Regions:
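Anion-recognition interface
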Residues: 2-347
């Protein structure tokens, strides 16, 4: 009697963010537990990770034509070789920068084909948060990366186009159904898992993957935290001044602000909340939230009354009467002193 076994496809979860939904914390957790994951028949590949505890950003950058891509951090070909050589039946690839590929479906088809050719069936996991909170958090993050536009200018573009574009190919889509529809067309609607963001993200992520029974070793809080309002304003000034600088020098100046110590204001720790913007986001993107709820039974909520009440209490206009403006000035001067000292040391 001859026994015949049919080789089944392995499964791969492709986590695509989106940005500002706990992706950094999730990737750090998975990377630090990669040996434990292998022991449970799960691979979190090394290829494409730009550091020991990062996600697979280099793969997303390769597909998106991002100048940050370097072959030394692993290519799609090397990722596929690692996946093919693994005995694990399940793999996880994660980068919020895969989100950008909703505007490049050909690259998604290329990725899908490459992964299928080494024996994997792909499921896409994407997290969303309500657009008002997303806007506040994303704006602060982009200021860290050199954005010099006001929050009003940023929001105006979001309301007008449903997206915000920076550095040419960083496209942050607020009309979430556009992202979902592109990935669903490539990977199949039944293979796209759309989730509403809640913190901590790893519990929900493992549940979607069917891995809720796995107990990962939690590390220190590695989330990408928002900056105090003073630092955001200081960075806006810096970004305007450093437009003509090389990215390396501009980054040194920004990093000086990141590391600066400023007095704590525990009762005034707000971001850029404003009741008007919350209402505008609610109305502008209500069709998006309705579409997601209808097609994926996922509810992205925004608690209007609660958010507006807290926003009024800590709006920037209200805060400026209380905060000391010299904190911002000192941050700017300190940042430029770092660059000045660096230049003088190289003479």
């Amino acid at each position: 009697m001859t026994n015949t076994t049919q080789k089944s496809c392995k499964r791969l979860f492709l986590h695509i963010g989106t940005h500002k939904t706990g992706s950094t914390a999730l990737q750090t957790l998975l990377a630090k537990n990669d040996r434990l994951l292998v022991d449970n028949n799960i691979l979190f590949p090394n290829s494409g990770r730009i550091s020991t505890c990062s996600g697979h950003h280099n793969i997303a950058w390769e597909l998106n034509g991002d100048p940050r891509f370097t072959k030394e951090n692993g290519t799609i070909s090397e990722l596929c070789l690692e996946l093919a050589a693994s005995d694990c039946n399940l793999a996880i690839i994660s980068s919020e920068d895969f989100e950008y590929l909703h505007q490049k479906p050909d690259q998604l088809y290329f990725l899908k084909t490459a992964l299928e050719n080494v024996g994997y069936e792909i499921d896409v996991i994407v997290f969303f948060r309500d657009q008002a909170r997303y806007a506040y958090s994303l704006y602060q993050e982009l200021v860290k990366h050199g954005l010099d536009r006001t929050f009003y200018s940023f929001s105006k573009e979001v309301f007008r186009t449903g997206a915000f574009v920076m550095n040419g190919n960083w496209r942050f889509c607020f009309s979430y159904e556009v992202i979902i529809q592109t990935f669903a067309k490539v990977f199949g609607s039944n293979h796209v898992h759309c989730e509403a963001y809640s913190n901590p993200i790893h519990i929900q992520f493992l549940l979607v993957c069917g891995l809720s029974e796995i107990s990962l070793e939690l590390s220190d809080n590695t989330s990408n935290k928002a900056l105090p309002l003073e630092k955001i304003v200081a960075l806006l000034r810096i970004n305007e001044f450093t437009k003509g600088m090389s990215e390396q020098d501009a980054s040194k100046v920004r990093n000086a602000i990141f590391s600066s110590q400023i007095p704590e204001h525990p009762n005034l720790s707000c971001t850029l909340n404003n009741p008007v913007f919350i209402i505008l986001h609610y109305v502008r993107f209500r069709p998006t939230r309705t579409w997601i709820r209808t097609h994926y039974n996922t509810k992205i909520t925004i608690t209007i009354i609660k958010d507006i009440t807290s926003s009024i209490k800590c709006s920037p206009i209200f805060l400026w009467k209380r905060r000391r403006r010299h904190i911002i000035d000192s941050l700017v001067y300190e940042a430029f002193d770092v660059l000045k000292n660096d230049v003088e040391s190289q003479k």
